[in-house]
Amino acid sequence: MPNSIVIHKHGGPEVMKWEEIPLQNPGRSEVLINQTKVGLNFIDIYQRSGVYPLDLPSSIGMEGVGVVESIGEGVENVKVGDRIGYVMGTPGSYTESRLYPADRLIKLPEFLSDSQAAGVLLKGLTVSYLINRTFAVEKGQTVLLHAAAGGVGLLACQWLNRLGVEVIGTVSTDEKAERAIAHGCNHTVNY
């Protein structure tokens, strides 16, 4: 049986317990993933602390990378041995192995390491949503980006810069200003 970080009550980091969990064979349209890396995000803290309550006991974690170990009936988009990533869906990425719906997986390109993928999937979806759906940003526009030196902010700086957008980023220290500028932010406001 694989081990997983499980919470039985909401609270601080001390509520996380490393436990063996039962794991069945993949059902229809599911795959069994051997996790290699896990993304750490604020949503995990919110779930653990109860800001976003979970039915307990529960594992936490919304972003992971791994290798397909086995597939259930009807799975055609991935095969055993594929390197994959996933984000969102049912919490539970803080684990050695897990079942996951095959249609929510993405195959990872060779140039992207497992560590890079696990650290960028949720942030990348967030940036894409903000600059494509919330407001379709176009070349020549100016964007004010709060927390420009955070995980989402640094990715947004790069993406917006690539689109030809003038990026003004808010930061809280001179070091963060330097980091934001190094990632494509044109100007910073240090508050």
What role is predicted for each listed range?
Residues 161-191:
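Adenosine-nucleotide cofactor-binding segment
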Residues 1-3:
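Extreme N-terminal starter segment of soluble prokaryotic enzymes
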Residues 11-17, 42-44:
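Short N-terminal binding/cap micro-motifs at the start of the first secondary-structure element
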Residues 22-39, 49-92:
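Glycine-rich beta-strand-centered segment in the early N-terminal region that forms part
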Residues 152:
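Hydrophobic/small residue at the entry helix of a nucleotide-binding pocket
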Residues 149, 157:
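N-terminal Rossmann NAD(P)H-binding glycine-rich loop of SDR-like oxidoreductase domains
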Residues 85-147:
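NAD(P)H dinucleotide-binding glycine-rich loop of Rossmann-like/cofactor-binding domains
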